[in-house]
């Protein structure tokens, strides 16, 4: 059976940071308060991605945090990451599962499309991600997901991730609608105090489903 974890909390995604040491310094203080970390760097070449993913894998292992690689199942296998996140043009779940194994965490971007969510769940995805819920500077998109979509996606029986311009104050409503994980990039990394920012996101879960 594919891995469909029972999870909730902050799903942190890394920014496009070219300096590996700085990426580690920015990320390490946050690892004790997040559920998953996704390595995403759209500006890096293959060599830098390998170095950064390997360094983050070691840091995550020290904190017991699963590392998910964005868009690249081969890189996930190479560094021993726990999973991969697949976008619209990043391959299929079956191929990633064959490469990474039944216990791998394989997520799929479903944007504002419940049918894509149904297809992902049927193919064995570990989780589905919907968004953007709000305007975001991290990724240009005109697609907008809604809390109603999260509610509808309960039928999929897989964890639901909400992503896209989400501020801490917006977390309780999304959790109430069914979000298991809140994915965030700039809301944490661009905050004046990233550690406090993570706690702000966590507090949104505590208000709705009991303390994390």
UniProtKB/Swiss-Prot annotation:
One of its GO terms (cellular component) is cytoplasm. Keywords: Magnesium, Metal-binding, Thiamine biosynthesis, Transferase. It catalyses: 2-[(2R,5Z)-2-carboxy-4-methylthiazol-5(2H)-ylidene]ethyl phosphate + 4-amino-2-methyl-5-(diphosphooxymethyl)pyrimidine + 2 H(+) = thiamine phosphate + CO2 + diphosphate; 2-(2-carboxy-4-methylthiazol-5-yl)ethyl phosphate + 4-amino-2-methyl-5-(diphosphooxymethyl)pyrimidine + 2 H(+) = thiamine phosphate + CO2 + diphosphate; 4-methyl-5-(2-phosphooxyethyl)-thiazole + 4-amino-2-methyl-5-(diphosphooxymethyl)pyrimidine + H(+) = thiamine phosphate + diphosphate. The keyword NADP does not apply. Its EC number is 2.5.1.3. It holds the Pfam family TMP-TENI. SUPFAM superfamilies: Thiamin phosphate synthase. InterPro entries: Aldolase_TIM (IPR013785), ThiamineP_synth_sf (IPR036206), ThiamineP_synth_TenI (IPR022998), TMP_synthase (IPR034291). It is an enzyme of class 2 (transferase). Mg(2+) binds at residues 71, 90. Binds 1 Mg(2+) ion per subunit. Pathway: Cofactor biosynthesis; thiamine diphosphate biosynthesis; thiamine phosphate from 4-amino-2-methyl-5-diphosphomethylpyrimidine and 4-methyl-5-(2-phosphoethyl)-thiazole: step 1/1. 4-amino-2-methyl-5-(diphosphooxymethyl)pyrimidine binds at residues 38-42, 70, 109, 139. The keyword ATP-binding does not apply. One of its GO terms (biological process) is thiamine diphosphate biosynthetic process. 2-[(2R,5Z)-2-carboxy-4-methylthiazol-5(2H)-ylidene]ethyl phosphate binds at residues 136-138, 165, 185-186. Its cofactor is Mg(2+). GO terms for molecular function: magnesium ion binding; thiamine-phosphate diphosphorylase activity. PANTHER family: THIAMINE-PHOSPHATE PYROPHOSPHORYLASE, THIAMINE-PHOSPHATE SYNTHASE. Condenses 4-methyl-5-(beta-hydroxyethyl)thiazole monophosphate (THZ-P) and 2-methyl-4-amino-5-hydroxymethyl pyrimidine pyrophosphate (HMP-PP) to form thiamine monophosphate (TMP). Belongs to the thiamine-phosphate synthase family. This is Thiamine-phosphate synthase. The lineage of its organism: Bacteria, Pseudomonadati, Pseudomonadota, Gammaproteobacteria, Lysobacterales.
């Amino acid at each position: 059976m594919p891995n469909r974890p029972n999870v909730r909390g902050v799903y942190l995604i890394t920014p496009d940071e070219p300096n590996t040491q700085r990426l580690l310094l920015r990320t390490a203080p946050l690892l004790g308060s997040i559920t998953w970390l996704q390595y995403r760097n759209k500006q890096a070449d293959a060599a830098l991605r390998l170095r950064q993913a390997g360094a983050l894998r070691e840091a995550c292992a020290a904190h017991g945090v699963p590392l998910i690689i964005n868009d690249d199942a081969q890189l996930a296998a190479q560094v021993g990451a726990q999973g991969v996140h697949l976008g619209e043009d990043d391959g299929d779940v079956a191929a990633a599962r064959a490469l990474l194994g039944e216990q791998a965490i394989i997520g799929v971007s479903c944007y504002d499309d419940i049918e894509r969510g149904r297809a992902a769940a049927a193919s064995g995805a570990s989780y589905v991600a919907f968004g953007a819920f709000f305007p975001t500077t991290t990724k240009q998109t005109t697609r907008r997901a809604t809390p109603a979509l999260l509610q509808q996606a309960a039928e999929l029986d897989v964890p639901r991730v909400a992503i896209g311009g989400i501020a801490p104050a917006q977390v309780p409503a999304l959790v109430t609608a069914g979000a298991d994980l809140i994915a965030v990039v700039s809301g944490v990394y661009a905050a004046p105090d990233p550690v406090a920012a993570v706690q702000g996101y966590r507090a949104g879960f505590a208000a709705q489903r009991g303390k994390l």
